Every structure is written in structure tokens, then in C-alpha cells.
Regions:
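A short mid-domain helix/strand-loop element embedded in enzyme catalytic domains
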Residues: 1-25, 36-45
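A detector for short metal-coordination/catalytic motifs
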Residues: 18, 22, 29-30, 40-43, ...
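Ligand/cofactor pocket segment of small-molecule handling proteins
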Residues: 33
Length: 135
């Protein structure tokens, strides 16, 4: 069991979780499923530009987010998958194809118009640039 150091740490965690709900709600205004697998049942709100590198407004900006299944979310956070400027899924050269096929299940080629806007494309450009050695 983890104990919090002080009330400031507790308040920070509560505010972060509160912001996460708002963040996911903003993403849900643009999409309702994983943009890779099409799953609606098990999706997570994923920051494109990670929380740790985002300023306060970017942390809750729904355009800095996409819905992904847990497997896709983990791969995206590690820079093992991303999306090109046309919304197509791209796989890292560091990710074995057999592992990719098992984890992704299948790229259903979901309509990516929800990410094809200037704001989200800029965040995706940041993601590709910061993981450029992977692609």
C-alpha cells in the first residue's frame, strides 16, 4: 500500500484525476472507439503529447487525445506505433511484426477523420518527432 507524503500530493493527484475525466469527455466529443481496432468496450483516453511534457492547457485539450485499447495505448506511449499525417497507423521498426499482430489484433482501418484536424495533427507531429528514431 502506498501512502501519500502530504496533503499537497493528495490534492495534486485528485486534481489530475479530475482533469482526466474532463480530458476523456473532450475526446468523446470527437470519437467513440479505438481508432485502431474499432473497439468501443475497452478504450482509454490517451494523451498524444504526454502529460509530463504538456503545459496546463495541453493536459486537458481534447485534441491532444485519442481513444485506444490498453494494448494500443501502451504501444503508442512507448512510441512503438503512431499515425502519419493522413491518419494511417505506422509501426515502429523496433516492434517485431509477430508481436505487433498479436497485440493490435487487427488494424480495422477505422475512419480517422476525427484526428485529421490541425490541432490533433500537430500533436501527432510532436509524437512522431519525439519518437523519430523508432520509425
Amino acid at each position: 500500500k502506498r501512502y501519500l507524503k502530504d496533503s499537497l500530493e493528495y490534492e495534486t493527484i485528485i486534481k489530475a484525476r479530475h482533469g482526466q475525466g474532463f480530458f476523456k469527455d473532450e475526446i468523446l466529443k470527437r470519437m467513440d472507439r479505438c481508432i485502431v481496432t474499432g473497439s468501443k468496450e475497452i478504450v482509454e483516453a490517451c494523451h498524444i503529447k504526454p502529460w509530463v511534457f504538456s503545459n496546463d492547457s495541453e493536459k486537458i485539450d481534447g485534441y491532444n487525445g485519442i481513444l485506444l485499447t490498453p494494448n494500443c495505448h501502451k504501444l503508442f506511449d512507448k512510441g512503438l506505433i503512431s499515425f502519419d499525417p493522413n491518419g494511417h497507423l505506422i509501426k515502429s521498426k523496433k516492434l517485431d511484426s509477430k508481436v505487433f499482430n498479436k497485440l493490435i489484433i487487427e488494424d480495422k482501418n477505422i475512419d480517422k477523420t476525427s484526428i485529421l484536424n490541425d490541432k490533433t495533427l500537430n500533436y501527432l507531429k510532436w509524437h512522431r518527432k519525439n519518437f523519430k528514431s523508432n520509425f
